[in-house]
Every structure is written in C-alpha cells, then in structure tokens.
C-alpha cells in the first residue's frame, strides 16, 4: 500500500535526523557527470583500476543490488547512468550500514571515488565516500521498469522523466533543437526580440483567443494567438531581421497535433520575399536534422523522411484540382460545398474561406515528404501579399511534412489600403458567425502607413517539429507539461501534502 510506504519513508527521514544526518543538505561539489566519466574512462580494460583518479558525481539511485558486505548500485543524472560499487571495508561498517538501511531507489546521492572496469567490462565508480542529498519520500513506479500509463505520464512528467530514460532524451533533443535554431539564426544576424503576450486585439492568426481581464485598466485582454503583427512593427521601426521563440494560445480543440498552448518561432526579414523564406526554411530544418542525426534522413512512425534540399514545391490550386476535381478559384461556392458533402464533410459555415480550408484538409495527408504548399487564394490569406502573377492568389507557403502543416510563411502584405480592405472582409466573416476571423487592428494599419519594406515572414510550430525529430506520435509527448484534465489527487494520502 502506498500509504504504508509513505509512512515508512517519513519515519526514515526522522531517524536520519536523529542520527545527525541531514536528509536535504545544501550543496555537493560535483566534478564529473555520468557522460564525462564514460567519455574519459571508457577505454579502461576489464579489471583495470585508476585509484589516483578521484571523481565526484551525483544523481538519483535507480537500482540497488546488495551482496552482504558490498553493494552495486546505479545512479542516473541528466546525461545517463553509471554503475557504482561500495564496500563495508572501504567506508566503515557504520557508514555501510547507514547505506544499506536508508539508501533506496529514488534517493539522490553524491559519491566520491575512483573509476574501474568490472570483470564483465562495465565502467564503475568505486565509492570511497557518499552523501545523501535528497531522501525520496515516494517509491519509483513499477519497480523502476518505467511509467507506462500515458495519462499519468502527462500529469506527472517529473516521474516519467525519472522512470523513462527515453522521455528525458526526448526533451534533451527538444532543447538542443531550440538551441540550434537560435544559433543558426544568430549567425545570419537575426535579432531575438520580444512581443507582448497580453494583447488588446488578438491578431496575427485565425483562431479563437483566450480572454482575460486586466483589473488595473478595467478592460478585457487576450492571450496572444501569434506575435506576427508586433514583429512586423519591429520591421517598420527599423529592425531588418528579427525572430521570437515563445508561447501562443488558441482556445480550440486538443488533438494529437493541436495544443491550446504551444510554442512557435516567427522570423521576419526585410527586403526579402516568400522565395527567400522557403530557402531559409529548408536550410534551417535540414541542417537541424543533420546536426542531430548526422544525416538528412530520419524515420517517423515507420516512414523514412528525406530533408535534403531542395524540397518539393506544389501549388494549392493545382494539387486540390488533381485530387478532388474542383477548382478553388473558378468553381462557385455550390460546387465546393457539393464536393465536400460528397465526401462526408460538413463545413462549419458555407463561407468560401472555410470550404477551401476543408478541401485542403481532405488531401493534406497525401503529402508525406518535406514539401512546400504554395500560392494560397487571397480568401484564406488575409495577411499575405497578392501574388505578383495572379492577384487572386497570395505569395504564401506552408511546409507540409507527414501530412502535417509545420508552419506558415508569406511575402508580407505591406500595402495599408489592401490590408484595410482585408480586415474589413474579415469583419464581415465575424459578423456572419466566424469566431476565428481576424479582427480590425487600426494601429497596425497606421504602422503600415509609415512604411513596411518588402518583407518575408515565416512561422514554424516548434512542438510539431519536435514530434518529427523524436518520432513522437502526439504533441503531448513533446510538451513537458501538457494540458490534461484535472483529477482528484487521492494518491497524496499519507504524504506531507495531506
């Protein structure tokens, strides 16, 4: 019973204090990680000992194997695991008995000793001294074989990380990828900037916003759905290359590829267009894959994906027409609606914009390899510049990989008159019941009136990108603390929380 275990461990904490042992000390001098130990001493031969090489490391005890007056145990830190060996004859009977009685899987300890290779060839730390650094009050799940219940893993990600090395590795890759993206853009002289998360007008994307209230000004505010309009204000103000990595919020559904709270990167470059942003996208992502895996190829859900540039380009109008026999520019609304109904799709509204988006949804999953979907109609692209060869289209693209939209990019609309008319068209959609339609932002129009240079803009969903990079089937697998429904915490019975 969990209550009995919690009670026993609480008792052990009190016993340690009575023995003069602080179960939660302040500091430990760590000279090596498990990774540096492995790198420096892996070449040792079985049975070889380096008594003069003192090392101090620390981590969580994962396994303990007692053998009378000696013990093998494994500790885990952020970088991996290392075996350790402790003997009564080395550290004194009193301290060895303390280890035997009070050190258990889950505890965090520091050890000092020297490296050797066991007869079976496993690199091991011979412990000359140890210190308890944090006494675990809860047992590791399922005797350390890992946390297998997905919902529990999402709610208690800290336990998931402890129990499953693959989870820790997944998030290590996530933050290594984000670091690479920053370094890549910084080398190209992009400047990382910040924009507000609280907005008076939720702009920059077609989505239903979260609403909050600012008591100081007695007014409603919105969590941002995208930083786009503020980033373009930076370009108006004189910045030429900017990016922001941050959280966005959309009060919409949850699915394997949708989270109401998600991370994106948005990038804007003055004097560039969507062709430049395509080159930037395929260069950034392909070099990221190469950096992580040493190859442009990786396997996602059993399918090999090849990220080597140049990626394939397809045009939205032609692709939909080839698959569904409908022309999203020439055919009337009735034809679009008929094609959707014929395939069992009921649009939320009969607006042309929504029907075009639903038609694309029908064929998106056919696009597996890294591909740029290009030249969307003006109807569904209110912030993109009209196409230089066909004003019914826009200079817009979306990178599509494994049937998922990974981002969105434009030659940015910088004509204030055209932008004002697009906002007005969006207002009509809102009046007709479309909660996701863009709102009027007159200050943004004013910014454009001061002059936005020709600009290329790009947004990439970081979470979906990490799904691909870590072969994760759900977006919740790559968000450390995803949104999950709340439950009663009955398992806190018997703990300090009670």
From Swiss-Prot:
Pfam families: tRNA-synt_2, tRNA_anti-codon. Binds 3 Mg(2+) ions per subunit. GO terms for cellular component: cytosol. The keyword Protein biosynthesis applies. Its cofactor is Mg(2+). GO terms for molecular function: ATP binding; lysine-tRNA ligase activity; magnesium ion binding; tRNA binding. CDD domains: LysRS_core (cd00775), LysRS_N (cd04322). Its EC number is 6.1.1.6. It catalyses: tRNA(Lys) + L-lysine + ATP = L-lysyl-tRNA(Lys) + AMP + diphosphate. Its main location: cytoplasm. One of its GO terms (biological process) is lysyl-tRNA aminoacylation. Homodimer. Belongs to the class-II aminoacyl-tRNA synthetase family. This is Lysine--tRNA ligase. The lineage of its organism: Bacteria, Thermotogati, Thermotogota, Thermotogae, Thermotogales.
